[in-house]
Amino acid sequence: MDRRSRAQQWRRARHNYNDLCPPIGRRAATALLWLSCSIALLRALASSNARAQQRAAQRRSFLNAHHRSAAAAAAAQVLPESSESESDHEHEEVEPELARPECLEYDQDDYETETDSETEPESDIESETEIETEPETEPETAPTTEPETEPEDERGPRGATFNQSLTQRLHALKLQSADASPRRAQPTTQEPESASEGEEPQRGPLDQDPRDPEEEPEERKEENRQPRRCKTRRPARRRDQSPESPPRKGPIPIRRH
């Protein structure tokens, strides 16, 4: 009975449920639930995407601003250096223009006199260098005279007198060198070589000893008569190269036990 009553109760409950919520209504309710949940999820995803995009845009704007500020600072540092370098170049360009003196206009006669006066000291310097080189080539016996140098600023009649004195000194130095050359040339005497190898060179009277002038020629004659004797060569002793060979003193004694 209990089982039947329970089955009846379940059937009644189902019928009551179906009456209250028919199957069509139940399916519609489930579909609405799914739709509402999906819509809520989509909205959440959309909001999260929007927030992520906003954050990315903020980061980009911040980075761009930072890079722009760094570039502006670098440009600001480069610009003053370039401006300073340009100002330095301008100063350098201005300085040579200021340093150039204004050339005054002279006549041609003034230029000619200046060139003539410049050529005179050059000729004096050349003559002085010639005089200085000649005494170095002369021998030590000849007295060397150093030319007196005069300042280049003194010009006029003194130059002619100086040239005359230089020519006189040159002439005197040439004469002294001509006198010294024959003194240096001395006759060189060469000793006559012996004609034959066997003959001994004859000694002069100066080589002889004054103590015994009579004994020397006799000794020389005896030496010439006696033939030269060669020294006898002693036979070299041979040694045994083998270290094991016994000495040649006598027979080796044999011991018998």
Swiss-Prot record:
Leader sequence residues: 1-46
Biased composition (Basic and acidic residues): 86-103, 200-211
Gene Ontology CC: one annotated term: plasma membrane
Biased composition (Acidic residues): 104-139
Broad class of the protein's primary localization: cytoplasm
Compartment(s) of residence: Cytoplasmic vesicle, Secretory vesicle; Secreted
Transmembrane segments: none
Domain of life (superkingdom): Eukaryota
A Pfam family hit: NESP55
PTM annotation, UniProt: Binds keratan sulfate chains.
Molecular function per GO: adenylate cyclase activator activity; adenylate cyclase regulator activity; alkylglycerophosphoethanolamine phosphodiesterase activity; G protein activity; GTPase activity
Extent of Low complexity compositional bias: 70-82
Region annotation Disordered: where it falls in the sequence: 61-257
Biased composition (Basic residues): 227-237
Miscellaneous comment: This protein is produced by a bicistronic gene which also produces the ALEX protein from an overlapping reading frame.
Entry similarity comment: Belongs to the NESP55 family.
Protein name: Neuroendocrine secretory protein 55
Gene: Gnas
